């Protein structure tokens, strides 16, 4: 019933044709927006209306024109007329017969016309015939009369339809050369359907359903001959007089302004139009019909009219005005006012081409004329304006000046295409940026793409006309390039000259280019040789060759030049030979960091310039080679005709530029286009390709501030199809979530700024129209709530509408597709939104048949529905629709839910196989399919059908496509997949969240892995830096479940590769079906959930899970699966290493599916398939090695013990090792990349020695057969080394050193790191933490016991390894545990996991426990802990319990005298932040009161164990509560001697002494410091410094303590003191009292300097003291130290000056002392040769240094020590150019006695510094670091008032302001501390005597 009602309404015309208001409410007629519910609608009864009119190409007039030309090519001949005649004048008369009101005629005349033609010609040659073009009409009579009136006898007539020529044959030589003739015809022609051109008819239907006809003409290129006999070629220009006899009820139009018609019998009218100017025949036009118009008169007084048919009047004004303004601006630009009195724009219901440029009467397809603001978007409006401006440009380029023949068609169409956008910028100046971007998008990019297609042809095309992308888009792009080369003004001057010269005639390319050459010459425009530019020569390779240049732009030098080269974009071997050999002279407009303003360059076609001096020639024609420091860009104006590809380094620099400073939209667009098209080029050539660079670029571009705030439609439109290609790969699979994440990554910021309303900015509004539907499809931002609310408002506004939604929708047309999409997608199942839209669609196709935009928006919106039921309705609509099936089914391609519904619908309706829509249907259904499962699904459908051959071919095509896409996804797309994981998904977490509902225990993993890194084993390029693997995990299920959740991250697999088996007692595998469609990844948790089919329950039993997958290797050092590169071997070649680190980041789940939590310990059976020339290492020893012939080898490893997944390790590479065996026979090896193993001997000894200690001390043998230490050339920045069980992996400098260059710090760092990781083999590997918040169970133990491992290995270093390290751990822990916002508990969920607390505070607390429990009890408790929890997991509670048992066994009591409970004791220390400060206060004169408070001043309290040292004893007491808990101990008389609480820094606390207690300690130190240990002395210095720094003490209280240092001889105290001395020397560097401070330092250290001098002895503590003393005394200008430095330096120069192997052997100076020697020796030298020597030696290290420590940094630092201003400036310039690293800035600054070298250099070189290849903050930090005077502060501020300051960008200004804050802070420090500090020095040391 509903269908009949709708059809009835259609026929009786109750709806107006084009309506903007609702029809009156009719009884019984339901409004489409009345309330309803989806569940009440019978889906099978829903019926549809279908539109009767829809343009085939609604948004692209050029496609319409191309379609027209293709149709015409079926009957057009290109046979040319002989050059016998010259056309002078035509008089034409036409009477058309077509249905019109009141007109009657014989039926046989219907859709014909009568015609009379009188043609005046001049004979150019003698002949026997007159030959003209004529086609498809009947000639009734003809006559030829010469100029004198003499009739020329015509003996016969010949009409050849093949050549479309008519010959009137007279006597021999009857046609006399030079004679003028009139040739007259009377004939009858055909009025064709609109598809056939000539005179054609079309029609429209009025609201009452009546059909109204109209006629018009379409003559281009060869159809004038269908209308009248003629010389129908462009070059035969003539004048035309046209008369039309037409139905009096109609309107007649032609090229010229109509005159008053003459009526005949009130039925017919006759009108004669004024004679035309000279013009080509194809431009003649007339039209007759019921036309109406809107008018506009422009500033040139030209009348422009927009014509339509009745009912369209209200939509024509925009066209009239736009046309008038385009005409005016074109007249202004060309300097030639439009020569006709009127310009008509006639819109027809049907027109084969989008538009036709007939002079004065342009005919269009209606949508380019009628602008309906209720349906049409901004993009539709601009498209109409563009088409009009295109056709109006033809009035000059094509009509006024016409191409001589169709080979130069670009002279018509190229100009029109160029000006259609260019001239709009003058019409709509506020939209200029948008329009210019459209020109690059729609002209340049389309032209470049067309020029490399298989059907490409030269721009000048003898086989023309070619109405295609070459002619239009390449032609327009040539003009854009010429404008850029000549300059806009010169180009305009040249175009004006061309038009003036060639007006009313015909032109070819030579005419244009020669005119431009003359103009260029008169304006002194030069070419690449510096000669006057010859435009003709320049353009020849562009117009006569296909293809375009590929410009390779190499900018990979640190400071060197960028270089260019060119080649044809396509392989030259596939191209037809040309005289230019596919080379071009390429104009480039470039900019770089040093030349930010664009400048012109040429990349010449060939070397050599004639008639020029050879030197000048070489200079002028050399390829561009500009200084390229950091970034450089070319084609800034996006005018170069070619594609530019940047090398990887240059590309990265451009990315950095875009991030920092942004670029214009056109450059963004061209960069994206060039990257994508280059990728396609490489793909076609079967070379490595990928989307990664494109994606990197897009990521940066779409997150720039400019795009975020003002999004560019053109940039988005360039990128979106590429993004869609990527989306297509993943939309239907397990990684479908990648697609919305990708769009959110790129566009979330832009979306957040969109207002969801029109802005009057076309760019933003068009972007909104195109982008927002994607935002809805991909759930960006608040689209769900917003679109649902907006559609609710639409529903409310249209509740009474009977005419659809266009007129009543309150929202912009730009937003409607998104609103409808959101309503369809997000509406709840009970909503009627979908059906409201469907009803609206049914009404819109009747209400607005010509304005299709609204009903198409409704269709596209409905395609977003996720409901199978409503999708089924939509599919039924589509399969019956009259619309283009590719368009409407194409909507469903973006909806992943649609494919299965399409499949099921086809299965239920197999008759669809006979539909003409079969191809489009299958295309949409399989568009996103790319899996083995989908291929089988499609084959199943195919096999159920009986197919014809054509149907079989269609199915076969899509089966092959699915198969190829599946293959592509798993091969070539691997790099893209890797990029998506790197950028869309969290790389890793430290730690990951716990995975809930893990019911598996005792996992046993079998991993077979192939590692694809460069080596002897071949693999496909797309497999590079990947691994392929199969993993089987056998496990015990402990509780019922219907799904398995396992950790897996960064792994690519097809769910169908997963197998699940039930393992029974007989070890038989029983397969368990898996629901592959519901296998789901959780990227944020790093898990995959595998459900059983039909939710089958898995009961407790043993199961195995098999997965085949591919994973990704980070190409830089990182956590997870990573790679290393190095240079090594005999040829110093690059090598690759595969390595793992699973403690942080991606975790082991990135290598294999596993239960990746520490508590899920399992065993691992690992087999690695790797290049044969490499070695594979893992946790266990290798047990089998199989070598294959193809360069690959399999290494199988023994099964591991039970261990946590994060300890699994692999290393593959070219390795060598040193080995030894421990006391118990453990094989110990240190591995390095080949050639470096010699430097690992020290680490090998530490490894073995630490194993021996751990085994012996804890009575727990190392359980593995071997322990390997792998020293890598690179390692993750997040860690130094990793304690994998049996295979320690870390950065090389932590395991190796070169003894010729290694300082004591270098050596001890190797010892400490190695021992630390070995200790982990017990604490972390054998016993493993239960969860990551207990990480101190690993790291605290390793940080504590490594000292004992070193001590066991090197007992002679006890003073350093034990004494110094124990103090240092406490020192660092206390330092950071009192910083708000930084400090956190040792046991904490607060990130980061790996911070100061678990390492240093954890170590300090273990030291505390060792002291409280006693070493023996602590040892016993830990041995028990290891034994009890070995191979399982432990918590802090387990540790405390083991220690408690040991403590109580030995009767250790707590603060209450009760058996000590370690947990109660340690919880406050491990679960709370900060530490206790015990403050001693003098009550009265003789009583000391102690109280406790937190360092961070909160209410936290601890039970503090304190060892108290007095002259006669060392006592132990507990301090509890606030006051200590025992007044006998803590409320005590003032001691007669000294009393040190916390002696030996045995507790984790600080003691704040009262003055009297403090000075008794100080007195003791002055009299006999050795009564206190070095640790105690260092602790006192550390505490005193802390109390002074925190404001609790006066500075002098701390300074008094330093007096005892005159006798100090231990490392820890000196390190504390010298850190303070160095700070003071730097603070006072520019204070006038600096000598006073220097004297203080020299006097305090005098005795120590005398004792230690410059003597090193191999004892680490001694050698560090020497280093510290030498450094600080040279800084303090100690004359003796400076003299020693000079002497050693002179010897050094003498010995090393000519060294060709570095300085390690020749120096003769201990590495600890080289930095001060080189620095202060060179500083005192007056010999410039010494500077040269140091500089040369530094340069040698830069060129030749390997991986290990060298003197390079020492020598570089020395260069900065010189005081020669010229040398300083030279070095600063070299830093800016990249010759020296920016670290030299710091050396120059700290050694600059004047303080202003960097500042003055900044004043003189501001721009260069800002452009330097390093961050501005480095310069500012170096410059201001020691400034502290009021003058310096004012000087720093003065720069802000200079003009140079304005050169800084916002970020740089902030950096500078931070620098001023530093100076201000330094100055404020002086205000507080300077006076008391100096007075104290004066008091104790007197005046300086240096």
From Swiss-Prot:
Cited PROSITE patterns: ZINC_PROTEASE
Cofactor: Zn(2+)
Annotated binding of Zn(2+), by residue: 390, 394, 413, 1316, 1320, 1339
Signal peptide range: 1-20
InterPro entries hit by this protein: Aminopeptidase_N-like_N, Aminopeptidase_N-like_N_sf, ERAP1-like_C_dom, M1_APN-typ, Peptidase_M1, Peptidase_M1_aminopeptidases, Peptidase_M1_dom, Peptidase_M4/M1_CTD_sf
The enzyme's E.C. designation: 3.4.11.-
List of catalytic residues: 391 (proton acceptor), 1317 (proton acceptor)
Pfam families to which the protein is assigned, alphabetical: ERAP1_C (PF11838), Peptidase_M1 (PF01433), Peptidase_M1_N (PF17900)
SUPFAM superfamilies: Leukotriene A4 hydrolase N-terminal domain, Metalloproteases ('zincins'), catalytic domain
Mutant phenotype after disruption: RNAi-mediated knockdown causes an expansion of the pachytene zone in the gonads of 31 percent of animals and a delay in oocyte nucleolus disassembly. Brood size is normal and embryos are viable.
Top-level taxonomy: Eukaryota, Metazoa, Ecdysozoa, Nematoda, Chromadorea
Membership in a protein family: Belongs to the peptidase M1 family.
GO MF annotations, alphabetized: metalloaminopeptidase activity; peptide binding; zinc ion binding
Leading EC class: hydrolase
Hydrolase listed as a keyword: yes
CDD domains documented for this protein: M1_APN-Q_like
Cofactor note: Binds 1 zinc ion per subunit.
Keywords per UniProt: Aminopeptidase, Differentiation, Glycoprotein, Hydrolase, Metal-binding, Metalloprotease, Oogenesis, Protease, Signal, Zinc
List of glycosylated residues: 110, 534, 581, 785, 803, 914, 1024, 1094, 1245, 1451, 1521, 1826, 1841
Gene3D superfamilies per UniProt: 1.25.50.20, Neutral Protease Domain 2 (1.10.390.10), tricorn interacting facor f3 domain (2.60.40.1730)
Protein name: Putative aminopeptidase-2
Function per UniProt: Putative aminopeptidase which plays a role in oocyte maturation.
Superkingdom to which the source organism belongs: Eukaryota
């Amino acid at each position: 019933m509903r269908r009949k009602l709708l059809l009835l309404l259609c026929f009786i015309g109750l709806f107006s044709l084009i309506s903007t208001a609702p029809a009156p409410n009719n009884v019984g007629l339901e409004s489409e927006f009345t309330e309803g519910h989806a569940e009440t609608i019978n889906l099978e009864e829903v019926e549809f209306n279908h539109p009767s009119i829809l343009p085939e190409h609604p948004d692209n007039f050029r496609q319409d024109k191309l379609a027209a030309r293709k149709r015409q090519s079926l009957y057009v001949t290109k046979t040319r007329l002989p050059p016998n005649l010259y056309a002078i004048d035509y008089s034409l008369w036409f009477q058309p017969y077509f249905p019109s009101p009141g007109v009657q005629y014989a039926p046989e005349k219907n859709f014909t016309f009568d015609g009379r033609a009188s043609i005046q010609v001049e004979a150019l040659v003698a002949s026997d015939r007159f030959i003209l073009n004529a086609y498809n009409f009947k000639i009734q009579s003809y006559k030829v009369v010469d100029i004198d009136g003499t009739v020329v006898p015509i003996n016969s007539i010949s009409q050849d339809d093949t050549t479309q020529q008519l010959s009137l044959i007279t006597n021999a030589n009857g046609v006399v050369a030079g004679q003028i003739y009139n040739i007259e015809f009377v004939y009858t022609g055909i009025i064709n359907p609109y598809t056939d051109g000539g005179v054609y008819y079309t029609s429209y239907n009025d609201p009452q359903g009546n059909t109204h006809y109209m006629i018009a003409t379409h003559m281009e290129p060869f159809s004038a001959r269908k209308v009248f006999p003629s010389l129908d070629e462009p070059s035969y220009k003539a004048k035309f007089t046209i008369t039309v006899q037409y139905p009096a009820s109609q309107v007649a139009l032609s090229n010229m302004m109509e005159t008053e018609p003459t009526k005949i019998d009130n039925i017919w009218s006759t009108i004669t139009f004024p004679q035309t100017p000279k013009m080509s025949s194809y431009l003649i036009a007339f039209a007759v019909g019921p036309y109406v118009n809107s008018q506009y008169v422009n500033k040139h007084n030209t009348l422009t009219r927009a014509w339509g048919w009745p009912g369209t009047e209200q939509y024509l004004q925009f066209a009239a005005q736009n046309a008038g303004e385009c005409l005016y601006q074109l007249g202004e630009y060309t300097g030639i006012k439009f020569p006709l009195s009127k310009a008509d724009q006639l819109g027809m219901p049907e027109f084969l081409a989008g538009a036709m440029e007939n002079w004065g009467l342009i005919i269009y397809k209606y949508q380019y004329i009628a602008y309906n603001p209720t349906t049409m978007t901004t993009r539709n409006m601009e498209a109409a304006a563009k088409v009009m401006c295109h056709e109006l440009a033809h009035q000059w380029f094509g009509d006024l000046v016409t191409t001589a023949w169709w080979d130069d068609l670009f002279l018509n169409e190229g100009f029109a295409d160029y000006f259609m956008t260019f001239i709009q910028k003058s019409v709509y100046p506020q939209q200029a940026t948008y329009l210019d971007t459209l020109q690059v998008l729609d002209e340049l990019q389309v032209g470049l793409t067309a020029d490399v297609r298989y059907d490409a042809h030269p721009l000048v095309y003898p086989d023309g006309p070619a109405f295609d992308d070459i002619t239009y888009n390449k032609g327009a792009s040539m003009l854009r390039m010429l404008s850029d080369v000549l300059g806009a003004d010169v180009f305009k001057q040249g175009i004006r000259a061309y038009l003036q010269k060639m007006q009313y005639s015909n032109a070819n390319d030579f005419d244009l280019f020669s005119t431009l050459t003359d103009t260029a010459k008169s304006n002194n425009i030069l070419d690449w040789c510096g000669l006057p530019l010859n435009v003709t020569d320049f353009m020849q390779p562009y117009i006569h060759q296909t293809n375009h240049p590929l410009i390779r732009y190499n900018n990979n030098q640190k400071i060197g030049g960028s270089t260019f080269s060119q080649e044809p974009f396509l392989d030259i071997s596939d191209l037809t030979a040309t005289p230019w050999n596919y080379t071009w002279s390429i104009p480039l407009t470039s900019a770089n960091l040093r030349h930010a303003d664009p400048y012109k360059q040429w990349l010449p076609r060939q070397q050599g310039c004639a008639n020029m001096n050879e030197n000048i020639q070489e200079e002028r024609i050399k390829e561009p080679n500009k200084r390229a420091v950091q970034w450089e860009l070319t084609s800034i104006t996006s005018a170069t005709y070619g594609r530019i590809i940047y090398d990887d380094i240059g590309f990265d620099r451009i990315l950095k530029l875009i991030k920092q400073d942004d670029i214009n939209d056109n450059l963004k667009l061209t960069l994206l286009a060039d990257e994508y098209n280059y990728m396609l080029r490489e793909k076609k050539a079967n070379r490595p390709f990928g989307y990664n660079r494109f994606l990197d670029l897009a990521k940066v571009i779409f997150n720039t501030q400019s795009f975020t705030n003002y999004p560019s439609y053109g940039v988005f439109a360039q990128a979106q199809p590429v993004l869609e290609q990527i989306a297509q790969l993943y939309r239907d699979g397990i990684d479908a979530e990648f697609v919305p994440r990708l769009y959110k990554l790129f566009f979330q910021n832009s979306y957040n700024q969109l207002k969801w309303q029109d802005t009057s900015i076309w760019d933003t509004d068009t972007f909104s129209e195109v982008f927002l539907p994607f935002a809805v499809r991909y759930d960006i931002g608040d689209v769900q709530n917003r679109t649902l609310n907006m559609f609710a408002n639409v529903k409310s506004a249209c509740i009474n509408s009977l005419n659809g939604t266009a007129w009543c929708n309150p929202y912009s047309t730009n937003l409607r597709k998104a609103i409808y999409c959101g309503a369809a997608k997000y509406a709840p199942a009970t909503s009627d939104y979908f059906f409201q839209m469907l009803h609206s669609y049914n009404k819109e196709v009747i209400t607005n048949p010509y304005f299709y935009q609204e009903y198409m928006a409704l269709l596209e919106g409905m395609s977003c529905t996720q409901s199978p039921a409503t999708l089924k309705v939509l599919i039924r609509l589509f399969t019956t629709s009259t619309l283009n099936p590719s368009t409407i089914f194409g909507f469903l391609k973006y909806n992943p839910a649609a494919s299965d519904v399409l499949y099921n619908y086809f299965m239920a309706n197999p008759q669809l196989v006979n539909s003409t829509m079969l191809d489009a249907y299958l295309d949409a259904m399989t568009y996103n399919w790319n899996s083995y499962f989908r291929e089988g699904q499609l084959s199943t459908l195919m096999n159920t059908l009986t197919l014809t051959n054509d149907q079989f071919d269609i199915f076969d095509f899509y089966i092959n496509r699915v198969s190829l896409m599946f293959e592509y996804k798993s091969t070539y797309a691997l790099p893209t997949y890797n990029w998506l994981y790197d950028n869309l998904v969290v790389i890793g977490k430290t730690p990951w969240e716990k995975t809930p509902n893990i019911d598996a225990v005792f996992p046993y993993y079998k991993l077979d892995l192939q590692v694809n890194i460069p080596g002897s084993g071949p693999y496909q390029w797309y497999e590079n830096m990947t691994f392929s693997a199969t993993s089987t995990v056998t496990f015990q299920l402990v509780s019922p479940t219907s799904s398995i959740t396992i950790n897996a991250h960064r792994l690519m697999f097809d769910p169908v590769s997963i197998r699940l088996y039930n393992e029974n007692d007989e070890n038989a595998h029983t397969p368990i079906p898996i629901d592959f469609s519901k296998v789901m990844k959780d990227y944020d948790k790093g898990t995959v959930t595998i459900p059983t089919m039909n939710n089958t329950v898995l009961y407790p039993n043993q199961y195995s899970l098999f997965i085949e997958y591919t994973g990704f290797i980070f190409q830089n050092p990182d956590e997870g699966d990573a790679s290393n590169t190095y240079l090594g071997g005999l040829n110093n070649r690059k090598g690759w290493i595969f390595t793992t680190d699973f403690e942080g980041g991606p975790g082991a789940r990135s290598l294999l599916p596993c239960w990746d939590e520490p508590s899920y310990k399992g065993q691992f059976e690992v087999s690695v398939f790797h290049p044969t020339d490499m070695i594979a290492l893992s946790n266990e020893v290798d047990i089998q090695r199989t070598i294959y012939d193809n360069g690959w080898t399999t290494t199988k490893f023994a099964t591991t013990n039970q261990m946590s997944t994060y300890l699994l390790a692999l290393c593959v590479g070219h390795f060598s090792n040193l080995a030894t065996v421990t006391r118990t026979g453990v094989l110990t090896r240190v591995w390095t990349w080949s050639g470096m193993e010699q430097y690992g001997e020290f680490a090998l000894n530490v490894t073995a020695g630490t194993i021996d200690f751990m085994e012996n001390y804890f009575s727990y043998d190392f359980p593995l057969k071997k322990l390997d230490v792998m020293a890598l050339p690179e390692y993750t920045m997040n860690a130094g080394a990793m304690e994998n069980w049996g295979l320690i992996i870390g950065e090389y400098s932590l395991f190796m050193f070169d003894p010729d260059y290694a300082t004591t710090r270098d050596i001890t760092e190797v010892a400490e790191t190695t021992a630390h990781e070995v200790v982990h083999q017990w604490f972390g590997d054998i016993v493993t933490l239960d969860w990551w918040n207990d990480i101190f169970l690993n790291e605290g133990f390793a940080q504590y016991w490594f000292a004992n491992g070193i001590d066991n290995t090197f007992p002679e270093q006890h003073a350093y390894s034990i004494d110094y390290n124990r103090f240092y751990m406490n020192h660092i822990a206390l330092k950071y545990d009192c910083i708000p916002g930084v400090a956190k508990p040792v046991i904490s969920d607060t990130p980061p996991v790996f911070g100061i607390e678990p390492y240093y505070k954890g170590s300090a607390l273990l030291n505390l426990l060792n002291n409280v429990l006693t070493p023996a009890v602590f040892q016993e408790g830990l041995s028990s802990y290891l034994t009890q929890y070995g191979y399982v997991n432990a918590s802090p509670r387990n540790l405390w319990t083991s220690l408690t048992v040991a403590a109580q066994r030995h009767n250790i009591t707590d603060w209450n005298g009760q058996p000590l409970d370690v947990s109660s004791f340690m919880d406050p220390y491990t679960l709370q932040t900060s530490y206790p400060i015990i403050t001693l206060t003098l009550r009265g004169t003789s009583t000391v009161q102690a109280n406790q408070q937190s360092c961070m001043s909160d209410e936290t309290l601890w039970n503090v164990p304190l060892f108290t040292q007095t002259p006669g004893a060392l006592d132990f007491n507990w301090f509890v509560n606030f006051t200590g808990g025992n007044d006998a101990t803590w409320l005590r008389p003032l001691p007669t001697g000294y009393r040190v609480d916390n002696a030996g820094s045995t507790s984790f606390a600080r003691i704040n002494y009262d003055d009297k207690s403090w000075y008794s300690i100080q007195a003791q130190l002055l009299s006999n410091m050795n009564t206190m240990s070095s640790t105690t002395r260092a602790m006192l210095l550390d505490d005193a410094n802390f109390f002074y720094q925190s404001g609790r003490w006066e500075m002098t209280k701390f300074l008094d303590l330093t007096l005892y240092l005159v006798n100090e001889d231990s490392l820890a105290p000196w390190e504390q003191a010298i850190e303070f001395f160095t700070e003071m020397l730097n603070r006072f560097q520019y204070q006038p009292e600096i000598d006073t401070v220097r004297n203080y330092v020299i006097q305090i250290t005098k005795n120590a300097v005398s004792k230690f001098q410059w003597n090193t002895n191999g004892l680490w503590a001694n050698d560090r003291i020497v280093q510290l003393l030498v450094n600080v005394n040279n800084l303090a200008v100690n004359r003796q130290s400076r003299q020693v430095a000079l002497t050693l330096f002179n010897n050094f120069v003498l010995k090393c000056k000519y060294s060709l192997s570095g300085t390690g052997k020749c120096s003769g100076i201990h590495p600890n002392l080289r930095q001060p020697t080189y620095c202060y020796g060179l500083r005192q030298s007056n010999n410039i040769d010494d500077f040269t020597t140091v500089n040369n030696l530094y340069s040698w290290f830069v060129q030749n240094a390997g991986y290990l420590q060298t003197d390079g940094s020492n020598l570089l630092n020395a260069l900065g020590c010189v005081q020669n201003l010229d040398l300083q400036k030279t070095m600063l310039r070299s830093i800016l150019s990249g010759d020296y690293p920016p670290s030299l800035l710091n050396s120059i600054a700290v050694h600059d006695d004047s303080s202003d070298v960097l500042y003055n250099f900044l004043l003189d070189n501001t721009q260069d510094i800002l452009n330097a290849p390093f961050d501005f903050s480095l310069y500012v930090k170096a410059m201001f670091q020691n400034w502290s005077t009021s003058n310096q502060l004012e000087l720093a501020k003065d720069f802000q008032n200079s003009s140079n300051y304005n050169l800084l960008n916002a970020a740089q200004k902030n950096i500078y302001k931070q620098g001023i804050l530093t100076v201000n802070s330094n100055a404020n420090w002086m205000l507080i501390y300077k006076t008391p500090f100096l007075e104290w020095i004066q008091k104790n040391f007197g005046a300086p005597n240096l």
